[in-house]
Amino acid sequence: MDFLNSSDQNLTSEELLNRMPSKILVSLTLSGLALMTTTINSLVIAAIIVTRKLHHPANYLICSLAVTDFLVAVLVMPFSIVYIVRESWIMGQVVCDIWLSVDITCCTCSILHLSAIALDRYRAITDAVEYARKRTPKHAGIMITIVWIISVFISMPPLFWRHQGTSRDDECIIKHDHIVSTIYSTFGAFYIPLALILILYYKIYRAAKTLYHKRQASRIAKEEVNGQVLLESGEKSTKSVSTSYVLEKSLSDPSTDFDKIHSTVRSLRSEFKHEKSWRRQKISGTRERKAATTLGLILGAFVICWLPFFVKELVVNVCDKCKISEEMSNFLAWLGYLNSLINPLIYTIFNEDFKKAFQKLVRCRC
């Protein structure tokens, strides 16, 4: 998002020459991140469009998130790279206003999409039957529209407050001179969505864990009932078959060969039942770990990428004596942009349908 840059007009030619290698390295690194973000989000969008199996309301939210992150990559990152390398804004205040508008709106919209996806998954797990009826493309479209509208309402006021102060032609930043504007923008764009995401994913994990345990208990109970029925029917059917055979055996031999066979079968069936139950427990545990890993990656990436930036925004603009270097400000801004690269990876890498769709797209391009 916004950050402070200084002019390099006072630097000598020798100093500029010495700083050139580092500028080239920074430019190439950031350009590579922008290109990767553009490519990966393009793949997600294309996969959802061309793959009929992915035409699901839940994936429409992911597609909209990918579009938002794609806009960050093509409309926000390139201008930021030029600003960082040049160390001054050279494109005029009109372009500055447009860039800041797109920057704040798209980054806010990306964060709010994560909240919408969390809400969608929460309702799909906790109210599966009823929500399956409501989970239509129209419903997904309404959610996406609401996300964009809220993003605009959160993003626009800071831009109006920006013009209340004096701005230099060589800088493109938003100075939060009012505590109200700082709290409004940071809490609306991050802290409130963060709280919502944490609460929803905690409830999702608890609900998924409870659901796994209920299904496991139901399957074990069903197996025990079926096993008892099979055992009783087996005993009844074997009585008539074994009558003539048993009569031919000596009365002094209380244990017939058939009794031994029947005992062996029951023993094997019992062992098989316990083995099957153990395998189901192992699968259930694996699913729980996978669910926890997925949720951990989603929350971890989101918090690591955006929390430092918004802590900086809140502290620096509320505390007059608190300062931060230009390099650190740029780093925190790009750490937030990095979330637009990570989002499509996390939300699709655990989905087999997406993997197959990506493979088909790559083969077609090759």
UniProtKB/Swiss-Prot annotation:
It is found in: Cell membrane. Residues 1-24, 82-96, 160-178, 316-327 are extracellular. GO terms for molecular function: G protein-coupled serotonin receptor activity; Gi/o-coupled serotonin receptor activity; neurotransmitter receptor activity; serotonin binding; serotonin receptor activity. Coiled coil: none annotated. GO terms for biological process: adenylate cyclase-inhibiting G protein-coupled receptor signaling pathway; adenylate cyclase-inhibiting serotonin receptor signaling pathway; chemical synaptic transmission; G protein-coupled receptor signaling pathway, coupled to cyclic nucleotide second messenger. It is a multi-pass membrane protein. SUPFAM superfamilies: Family A G protein-coupled receptor-like (SSF81321). Disulfide bonds join C96-C172. A motif (DRY motif) lies at residues 120-122. Changing T108A: Decreased binding to lasmiditan drug. A motif (NPxxY motif) lies at residues 343-347. This is 5-hydroxytryptamine receptor 1F.
